[in-house]
């Protein structure tokens, strides 16, 4: 065999020989999923949670079925299921007194309600706003979800007079 042919044979053998640290032709695959939604979620605040005039040392409760309950209208994709979650304050701050004047606020396991498609709290489903819940938008003609929240304020006997405020944040995301 000629020397050139032998060099080519050795070169081919070196190229085809497995090498340490290099992949040996293993392949894999994954599936791809995409869930396209037809509509973004829009939240409209309809009413603030309002306790009205509160007496020092006397706790006051507003039920989610009461006229002073906080209320939202949520619009989204027809019949879509969602997760409803709240970020709740532990206290309300007096905006007229010296800094540090606060009043506790609490929420029970039945302080919130939701209703599919209908703005009627009497037929709404109660849930714990601390834990959140799942809900569902209405059918094509009425793709809405309505939310209500109540709570209890507990002013101390030494509470400073003034207006106490806080914020309740509601989050709604598709499942």
Regions found by a protein language model. Give the residues of each.
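Bacterial N-terminal signal peptides that target proteins for export
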Residues: 1-9
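N-terminal small/polar-rich segments of proteins
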Residues: 22-102, 134-175
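Intrinsically disordered, low-complexity regions enriched in serine, threonine, proline
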Residues: 3, 16-19
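Bacterial N-terminal signal peptides
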Residues: 8-17
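Terminal beta-strand-rich extracellular "head" domains
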Residues: 94-136
